[in-house]
Curated annotation (Swiss-Prot):
Catalytic activity: L-threonine + NAD(+) = (2S)-2-amino-3-oxobutanoate + NADH + H(+)
E.C. no: 1.1.1.103
Protein name, entry field: L-threonine 3-dehydrogenase
GO molecular function, one term: L-threonine 3-dehydrogenase activity
Subcellular location: Cytoplasm
Keywords recorded for this protein, A-Z: Cytoplasm, Metal-binding, NAD, Oxidoreductase, Zinc
Organism expressing this protein natively: Francisella tularensis subsp. tularensis (strain SCHU S4 / Schu 4)
Length: 351
């Protein structure tokens, strides 16, 4: 079968045409891949950064955002049928630890990821445990279903706290941050402010319903950044700090600024992963009585049902997809992702 694989311990990704079709077991499902989306994690693997060098076994078929069709299943599988349109949870968990047994599988300490630790979805076929498979309703396209993984991250982050009538600050306008704008607006947030240094994506955020999308690139230091943010807050009628903060960037200055402008009793969801150590004003957290929640992946499977219901209720995520390419143009897709001048990039696996 055709696949995209990390074949060498150096930057790049390579297409192969003779990868074996994976074998499925008693409780597994064999999925024919129709669409995949390129994730920031895939870009890290492509660039072969320090995290990738320490994490990714080579060779490895990568990718974990997908939509496809069930073409075979093990004898023990009763939850899906051949012909079903599906996506799937890319985090594989042990099922036996305290958190798994308590229904909190997203907190399994033995989690491994498809396309990271085991064969991924950038291939014509993928094997996945049936318990990880999620049926796609007829009303949701394959393109949108292939973005369920990052959309689930956005849903989990944004809906960890009530957004209705609240003032929301989002730091980081990558695809997940942009999805969070849509989610916050759909859920009735009062004001939504988002920050980034990428003007292309900030304009997308404005189009998605952000009250203000602030380019923070011009500000030379933390004091200037906070001063400008307070001006923005005043200009849009805010008399107190932000009620909810959604941290998507992993950037120290963004986190410090967020702590500075949160209201007393504010709540923060932290999804962004830093490349290094982060220093924070512990006093701001204590004296403001802030609540912080770390986010990793999606709640299995409450997040999946939530995003499906919201899409069916009219939340339009189609504009997050800015580029659609055939798999043979994968190199172009990665170059577009590297440029940052895009939302989600979809790869079509049809022949």
């Amino acid at each position: 079968m055709k696949a995209l694989a990390k074949l060498k311990k150096q930057p790049g990704i390579w297409i192969i045409n003779d990868a074996p079709i994976p074998e499925y077991g008693y409780n597994d499902v064999l999925i024919k891949i129709k669409k995949t989306a390129i994730c920031g994690t895939d870009l890290h693997i492509y660039n072969w950064d320090k995290w990738s060098q320490n994490t990714i076994p080579v060779p490895m078929i990568t990718g974990h955002e997908f939509a496809g069709e069930v073409v075979a299943k093990g004898d023990g599988v009763t939850s899906v049928d051949i012909g079903d349109r599906v996506s799937g949870e890319g985090h594989l968990v042990c099922g036996q630890c305290r958190n798994c047994r308590a229904g909190k599988r997203h907190l399994c300490r033995k989690t491994i990821g498809i396309g990271v630790n085991v064969q991924g979805a950038f291939a014509e076929y993928l094997v996945m445990p049936a318990v990880n498979v999620f049926k796609i309703p007829d009303s949701i396209s394959d393109d949108i279903a292939s973005t369920f993984d990052p959309m689930g991250n956005a849903i989990h982050t944004a809906l960890s706290f009530n957004l209705t009538g609240e003032d929301v600050l989002i730091t980081g306008a990558g695809p997940i941050g942009l999805m969070a704008v849509k989610i916050a607006r759909f859920c009735g947030a009062r004001r939504i402010v988002i920050t980034d240094i990428n003007e292309y994506r900030l304009q997308m955020a404005r189009d998605f319903g952000a009250t203000v999308a602030l380019n923070v690139a011009p500000f030379k230091n933390q004091d200037e950044l906070v001063k400008q943010m307070r001006k923005v807050m005043s200009d849009i009628g805010m008399t107190e700090g932000f009620d909810v903060g959604l941290e998507m960037s992993g950037i120290n200055s963004a986190i410090s600024m967020m702590l500075d402008v949160m209201n007393h009793g504010g709540k923060l969801s932290l999804l962004g992963i830093s490349a290094g150590d982060i220093s924070v004003d512990w006093g701001a957290i204590l004296f403001k009585g802030l609540t912080l929640k770390g986010i990793y992946g999606r709640e299995m499977f409450e997040t999946w049902y939530l995003m499906t219901s919201m899409l069916q209720a009219g939340m339009d995520m189609n504009p997050i997809i800015t580029h659609r390419l055939h798999i043979d143009e994968f190199q172009k897709g990665f170059e577009i992702m590297k440029s940052g001048q895009c939302g989600k990039v979809i790869l079509d696996w049809s022949s």
